[in-house]
Amino acid sequence: GLMDMVKGAAKNLFASALDTLKCKITGC
């Protein structure tokens, strides 16, 4: 459903943001 898509997109966005933050802090 639509809510599942929204939740999935939010989860992906959050995960990629977390990865970016981790890269900034620890270096990739």
Swiss-Prot record:
Function description: Has antibacterial activity.
Protein location: Secreted
InterPro entries the record matches: Antimicrobial_frog_2
Tissue expression from the record: Expressed by the skin glands.
Biological process according to GO: defense response to bacterium
Protein name: Ranatuerin-2AVb
Recorded family membership: Belongs to the frog skin active peptide (FSAP) family. Ranatuerin subfamily.
Disulfide bonding pattern of the chain: 23-28
Keyword annotations from UniProtKB, A to Z: Amphibian defense peptide, Antibiotic, Antimicrobial, Disulfide bond, Secreted
Listed transmembrane segments: none
Primary site of residence: secreted
A Gene Ontology term for the protein's cellular component: extracellular region
Organism this protein belongs to: Rana arvalis (Moor frog)
Top-level division of the source organism's lineage: Eukaryota
